[in-house]
């Protein structure tokens, strides 16, 4: 018995396989699913990073409040509470500003302002510059919208765009 030529069965009919049209349809379905899943996954990852930054800021805030309880004032630098080299989930240093002494050594920005040009906090400012790694003093600036900020002396902690 001789083998059948390539692509043909012994009866002269074609072997079952995938046509070019079927392959194009499969590729289109996979591309559509990827187009839906990748942005959803990116949003999930960003929300996870925001939650981690909020947790980090609460932890640093707790350490700063303990320091203030012992010394009667807040430190001028996060390294005084052992958090000077702590980075946010996007790889940037957390920003700290002591509003009482108007000082910020190391990784610190200036005082932050809300959309009505009022100071965010009266004790200290502590925030992450967010996903873009940029920030401006006013929360409604484009560079500040993704910042994770502490406001109202700790009563608010979340995205600057939602403050």
What is each residue range found by the language model?
Residues 2-6, 62, 102-163:
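Short, surface-exposed interaction loops/tails
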Residues 59-116, 120-122, 163:
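Extracellular/periplasmic head regions of type IV pilus-like filament subunits
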Residues 40-57:
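Aliphatic-rich helix starts adjacent to a transmembrane/signal segment
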Residues 1-16:
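N-terminal leader/signal peptides at the extreme start of proteins
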Residues 14-45:
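N-terminal single-pass transmembrane signal-anchor helix
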């Amino acid at each position: 018995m001789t083998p059948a030529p390539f692509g043909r069965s012994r009866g002269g009919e074609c072997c079952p396989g995938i046509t070019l049209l079927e392959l194009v349809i499969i590729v289109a379905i996979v591309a559509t699913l990827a187009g839906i899943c990748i942005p959803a996954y990116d949003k999930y990852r960003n929300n996870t990073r925001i939650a981690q930054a909020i947790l980090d800021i609460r932890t640093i805030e707790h350490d700063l409040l303990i320091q203030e309880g012992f010394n009667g004032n807040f430190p001028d630098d996060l390294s005084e509470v052992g958090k000077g080299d702590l980075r946010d989930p996007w790889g940037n240093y957390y920003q700290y500003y002591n509003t009482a002494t108007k000082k910020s050594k190391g990784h610190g920005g200036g005082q932050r302002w809300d959309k009505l040009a009022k100071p965010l906090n009266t004790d200290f400012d502590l925030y992450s510059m967010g996903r873009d790694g940029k920030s401006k003093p006013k929360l409604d600036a484009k560079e500040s919208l993704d910042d994770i900020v502490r406001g109202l002396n700790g009563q608010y902690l979340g995205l600057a765009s939602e403050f």
